[in-house]
Amino acid sequence: DFSVVATKMTNESAVGDDIQLIVSQEEVISIKKGSTVTYSQSGTVSVGEEEISHTATEDLYDQIIVPKGKFTRLILADGSSLHINAGTKVVYPKHFAKNKREIFVDGEIFIDVKRDESAPFFVKTAQFEVEVLGTAFNVSAYKGDDYAEVVLLRGAVNLKDNKKNTLKLSPNQLASIS
């Protein structure tokens, strides 16, 4: 189950002050502030211009941990782009399932989701879940905060909190969950 894997992985903490890319729970790669991590549809991973070799398996997840004072960019295999803020952890599969795309976030990201009506995109946090309908938006959901927020830039998203309350956002709207 994705939620169980994501929760387990986000309990791991960063070592030192470097941004860490954890590939398949095995290899830890330190990357420079502002570097872009790119996943291709063929399964290759690159940090900046450097390609990283690893075995791409659908049932394995990678994690990126960005410590305070740092930021990075992540391009997922489907072409969706994430700007990951300081103090953030993101857990995601190397390859998305054919009918569903989902990631887990503890912290803050700005995401521009590649539209694919056959495979909805979900951003899960400890406080809520966002169903993405081909859009760009910001999620701020740090574990220690009393509230979490979603700000929609374009497109549409459906929010569902832990009590199963739902809300649809339109562009330029903000939802705050406490």
Q: What annotation goes with each model-predicted range?
A:
Residues 148:
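Conserved active-site beta-strand-loop modules that form the wall/rim of enzyme catalytic pockets
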Residues 152-156:
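Short, conserved beta-strand element in jelly-roll/cupin
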